[in-house]
Design a protein with these regions (language model features):
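Divalent metal-dependent catalytic cores for phosphoryl transfer on phosphate-bearing substrates
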Residues: 1-96
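Charged phosphate-binding loop/patch that engages nucleotide di/tri-phosphates or the phosphate backbone
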Residues: 101-125
Length: 125
């Protein structure tokens, strides 16, 4: 929360309800401040936990890289790893669906940006 305040990030109720996603928002600003990252890298960092509508290819790649990284071990992850090399959008759709299903299974609401990303991606395939 301190970094969000430092960088002037306005957190909405969905952000506050999903604290594990906040590092994406603060990390993007940290990377810009300390490393001068350009807009496309800033955006890829910023949206790597929730996704967003109209994601660029780099944003999708970073989202999926985080979702399927080698230490992840959950049912279906290997299928998404394989799919990511064949169809980036299809892999994103499956990853977002799995993520949102898991959040719902735990009794929480998926982040609205994830739902927006999923709806947008479904119109792209």
């Amino acid at each position: 929360m301190r970094l969000a305040e430092k960088y002037g990030i306005v957190l909405n109720a969905a952000d506050l309800a999903a604290p594990k996603t906040l590092h994406a928002l603060t990390g993007a600003w940290f990377a810009r401040e300390h490393f001068g990252v350009p807009d496309n890298i800033f955006s890829a960092i910023e949206w790597h936990t929730t996704g967003r509508a109209e994601m660029a290819a780099l944003e999708k790649i970073v989202y999926l890289a985080d979702f399927i990284e080698p230490t992840r071990d959950f049912p279906g992850v290997q299928d998404i790893r394989t799919l990511a090399f064949a169809d980036l959008n299809a892999a994103m759709i499956r990853a977002l669906q799995m993520s949102m299903d898991e959040v719902k299974r735990r009794g929480a609401s998926p982040h609205p940006r994830s739902a927006e990303a999923l709806r947008w991606l479904q119109t792209q395939n």
